[in-house]
C-alpha cells in the first residue's frame, strides 16, 4: 500500500524515511531582489540624436563602460538593442586601436 503524506515529501536517509520537506515551499508571497518603481532609463543615443557611434569618441564610449572595463548591459544603460550593438562594436574597435583599455587599471 502507498503511504499518504500531507503536503510533505518524504526522503530516504540510510534506509529510514524522514517526514521533512525536501525543499523550501515556493509561492509563499515573498519577493526578494525586485525593484519597485524607480526611474526608467532612457536611450542616451536616441535622446541626443546620435546616429553614428564613432570609435574615436572615447568620451562618449566611457559612459557605457564599467569601472572594471566591461561593457555595461542594456538593462543598466537603457539603450535599445540596435544602439547597444553600435556601442559594443565601437568599444571593441576602440579597444583594438588601443584607445580604450580591455581591463581596468588596478
Swiss-Prot record:
<protein>
    <recommendedName>
        <fullName>Small ribosomal subunit protein bS18</fullName>
    </recommendedName>
</protein>
<keyword id="KW-0687">Ribonucleoprotein</keyword>
<feature type="region of interest" description="Disordered">
    <location>
        <begin position="1"/>
        <end position="41"/>
    </location>
</feature>
<comment type="similarity">
    <text>Belongs to the bacterial ribosomal protein bS18 family.</text>
</comment>
<comment type="subunit">
    <text>Part of the 30S ribosomal subunit. Forms a tight heterodimer with protein bS6.</text>
</comment>
<dbReference type="InterPro" id="IPR036870">
    <property type="entry name" value="Ribosomal_bS18_sf"/>
</dbReference>
<keyword id="KW-0694">RNA-binding</keyword>
<dbReference type="GO" id="GO:0003735">
    <property type="term" value="F:structural constituent of ribosome"/>
</dbReference>
<dbReference type="GO" id="GO:0006412">
    <property type="term" value="P:translation"/>
</dbReference>
<dbReference type="Pfam" id="PF01084">
    <property type="entry name" value="Ribosomal_S18"/>
</dbReference>
<dbReference type="InterPro" id="IPR001648">
    <property type="entry name" value="Ribosomal_bS18"/>
</dbReference>
<keyword id="KW-0689">Ribosomal protein</keyword>
<dbReference type="GO" id="GO:0022627">
    <property type="term" value="C:cytosolic small ribosomal subunit"/>
</dbReference>
<dbReference type="GO" id="GO:0070181">
    <property type="term" value="F:small ribosomal subunit rRNA binding"/>
</dbReference>
<comment type="function">
    <text>Binds as a heterodimer with protein bS6 to the central domain of the 16S rRNA, where it helps stabilize the platform of the 30S subunit.</text>
</comment>
<keyword id="KW-0699">rRNA-binding</keyword>
